[in-house]
């Protein structure tokens, strides 16, 4: 019979904790200790692909979570994620990161639920991270894991209000491995480590779009467009450095400039200011198989209207389709204030 290259495992975790007071405006929403469960399916790797050896044999999989936020105004969240598990300290310590979407049962409504300033929409972006001690096969197929879990929900300013919610929790879980016996790990050999990995400088062009709204509730959702051009240099198997420029066409800002000029006549805003912005950025890309994690730090060099400061951050995921084309899902923010969730399509030449 053919030797298996992967095995599967389930885990189910109960969690309970606190909502972090990251903004005084959500104080009225913190009334109890939120709790819930996370159910996950994991595919375990054993080094049959090179990226698995480079990252110390991670798992990848899907998770479903239910969270009771212990406040009728906030409602409950049901979420679905894709996740990776990374292992440290002889595989006793697991770090998991999951990204997906959540459904909120009681979002903001100006008449029936005006106190929910955390969630302006039913669909939210959801992220969770877990740092757990994990011991599999303690009793046959069963094992345990326990530690900290952080759950974050936000709609990325697709619709106001969007104060978002972060929960800091403790979790306790049971693991179940479908296979009694696991394949042997293919070890990282010296040729993997010392083999130089070189690529010439690559040129990237990305078109990004989406909808968003300013923090003024009811001001309306507008489409935005971003053109990004940058060069990247792969410095090793895992990383590339980026340098480039973004041009932002944000229609919500055009509306917001007009709103400031009319509603605050004492301010210097005339309403004629250009809503376009141009930024320069440096970035890093971390490659994990066909996916990559992108982090960028930018500075506006063309900034006619003062909106949330001159520096911006972009963080998100890319998925490559073949050698040249990729899709991207990114969050652009000014420090901790989200501006937009961007859907992008790009080419790397």
Predicted features, each with a name:
Residues 2-49, 185-232, 348:
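Short glycine/proline- and aromatic-enriched beta-strand/turn motifs that initiate or cap beta-hairpins
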Residues 12, 39-43, 80-86, 97-101, ...:
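Residues on the lipid-exposed face of transmembrane beta-strands in outer-membrane beta-barrel proteins
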Residues 8-28, 48-54, 74, 89-142, ...:
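Outer-membrane beta-barrel translocator/channel fold
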Residues 14-20, 43-45, 64-70, 99-105, ...:
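Transmembrane beta-strands of outer-membrane beta-barrel pores
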Residues 166-187, 338-349:
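Outer-membrane beta-barrel "beta-signal"
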Residues 8-12, 58-60, 93-97, 142-146, ...:
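Transmembrane beta-strands of outer-membrane beta-barrel proteins
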Residues 30-33, 68-77, 215-222, 235-237, ...:
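Solvent-exposed loop/turn segments connecting transmembrane beta-strands
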Residues 48-50, 91-93, 137-144, 180-183, ...:
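Repeated loop/turn-to-beta-strand initiation elements of outer-membrane beta-barrel proteins
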């Amino acid at each position: 019979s053919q030797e298996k290259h992967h095995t599967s495992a389930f885990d189910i975790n109960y969690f309970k904790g606190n909502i972090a007071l990251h903004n005084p405006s959500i104080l009225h929403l913190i009334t109890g200790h939120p709790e819930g469960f996370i159910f996950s399916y994991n595919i375990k790797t054993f080094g049959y692909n090179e990226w698995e050896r480079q990252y110390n044999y991670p798992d990848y999989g899907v998770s479903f979570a239910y969270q009771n936020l212990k406040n009728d105004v906030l409602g409950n969240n049901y979420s679905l994620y894709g996740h990776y598990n990374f292992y440290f300290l002889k595989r006793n310590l697991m770090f998991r990161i999951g990204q997906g979407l959540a459904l909120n049962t009681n979002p903001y409504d100006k008449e029936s639920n005006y106190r929910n300033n955390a969630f302006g929409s039913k669909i939210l972006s959801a992220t969770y991270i877990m740092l757990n001690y994990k011991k599999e096969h303690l009793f046959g197929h069963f094992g345990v894991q326990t530690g900290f879990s952080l759950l974050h929900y936000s709609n990325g300013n697709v619709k106001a209000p969007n104060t978002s919610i972060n929960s800091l929790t403790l979790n306790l879980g049971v693991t179940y491995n479908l296979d009694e016996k696991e394949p042997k790990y293919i070890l990282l050999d010296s040729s993997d480590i010392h083999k130089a990995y070189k690529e010439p400088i690559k040129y990237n062009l990305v078109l990004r779009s989406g909808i968003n709204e300013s923090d003024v509730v009811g001001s309306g959702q507008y489409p935005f467009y971003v053109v990004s051009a940058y060069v990247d240099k792969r410095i090793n198997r895992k990383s590339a450095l980026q340098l480039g420029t973004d041009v932002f066409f944000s229609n919500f800002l055009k509306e917001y400039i007009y709103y400031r000029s009319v509603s605050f006549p004492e301010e210097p805003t005339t309403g004629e200011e250009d809503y376009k912005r141009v930024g320069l950025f440096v970035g890093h890309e971390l490659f994990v198989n066909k996916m990559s994690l992108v982090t960028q730090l930018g500075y506006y060099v063309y900034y006619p209207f003062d909106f949330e400061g001159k520096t911006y951050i972009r963080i998100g995921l890319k998925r490559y389709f073949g050698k040249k084309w990729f899709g991207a899902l990114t969050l652009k923010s000014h420090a901790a204030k989200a501006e937009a969730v961007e859907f992008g399509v790009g080419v790397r030449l």
